[in-house]
């Protein structure tokens, strides 16, 4: 297989974890006979430094022409007083790609379950599906004076149906349960959300549907996260709840994410930030970035075997006690990456020898 991947290393630890992603992709090429054209483009703060814009037209054009986009990290205090903020580029990139579904799998490795703030953390295995293009972040009017400020929360039927349908399709391949999170006891937009969700559910009779109000959901994520399979919710609620859920893994450096469009390339990125305090020190945890690569291989390219090989190698290395500093170890970004690559190679040799 031959695919073109645009690599947006971005800021902070982004270039370091992106290098890990590239090395893993090169290992996949060697072991499985694929070829990936990796195209580097400027994005975020590094792009602002170059030409004053966080998302240059050249970068967006390259992304649109690609088969998938990998993003390292964006932002940092260096650009806090800049006219253009790096994070603005991320919103523009999502809009330019037309991605509407943000997918965050939340799992806990048995080898690192002790780092989770919860007991029985190794029972956690769910996915948060967040609507990305509607809701209060993108609705108008937005107004502010010295005395009053106004934001508008709007959702259209087709936006709700699109994201909920995606969640049901995903659940049908997992444990067949969808939890829809809203505030239908108060918000008109949530009442429409619940109505449309129930209509979509009729098309998936083998998938269980439950509704939970967002405040109760925030509590249940901590009290009983094992009850969830696929969570689907609107933009603001998803923004908050997915960050809450990410803490369950014990480190932000463990979890990947994907953002999908109806057509065109998807965007894959770790959920952690740019971590400027450790940038350039070879301390960043590359697991979330490598898992983002695994998601890309499976979800965009249909290379499930190759994606699983990366995941299995990561788990095997962790079970050997090899961990980066954020999860209680002494491995560097490069040494952990090399350990995963070696494990991938060894597992491939064992598989071929059977």
UniProtKB/Swiss-Prot annotation:
Question: Which GO BP terms sit in this record?
Answer: L-leucine biosynthetic process
Instruction: Tell me the route in metabolism or biology where this protein functions.
Output: Amino-acid biosynthesis; L-leucine biosynthesis; L-leucine from 3-methyl-2-oxobutanoate: step 3/4
Which positions does UniProt annotate for substrate binding?
94, 104, 130, 215
Q: Which HAMAP family match?
A: LeuB_type1
Residue sites binding NAD(+) per the record:
76-87, 273-285
Quaternary structure, from the entry = Homodimer.
Cite the entry's keywords alphabetically: Amino-acid biosynthesis, Branched-chain amino acid biosynthesis, Cytoplasm, Leucine biosynthesis, Magnesium, Manganese, Metal-binding, NAD, Oxidoreductase
> Quick one: signal sequence residues?
none
* EC class of the enzyme, as a word: oxidoreductase
Q: What does the UniProt cofactor note say?
A: Binds 1 Mg(2+) or Mn(2+) ion per subunit.
Family statement drawn from the similarity comment of this UniProt entry = Belongs to the isocitrate and isopropylmalate dehydrogenases family. LeuB type 1 subfamily.
Q: Which domain of life is it from?
A: Bacteria
Could you say which residues are annotated as the site Important for catalysis? 137, 183
Please tell me where this protein is predominantly located.
cytoplasm
Annotated binding of Mg(2+), by residue: 215, 239, 243
Q: Which GO terms describe its molecular function?
A: 3-isopropylmalate dehydrogenase activity; magnesium ion binding; NAD binding
Against PANTHER family, the record matches this protein to: 3-ISOPROPYLMALATE DEHYDROGENASE
Instruction: Give the UniProt subcellular location, in the record's own words.
Output: Cytoplasm
Q: Does the keyword Magnesium apply?
A: yes
| Required co-factors | Mg(2+); Mn(2+)
- In the UniProt record, the gene name given for this protein reads leuB
The name under which this protein is listed is 3-isopropylmalate dehydrogenase
As recorded in UniProt, its EC number(s) are: 1.1.1.85
Q: What is catalysed by this protein? A: (2R,3S)-3-isopropylmalate + NAD(+) = 4-methyl-2-oxopentanoate + CO2 + NADH
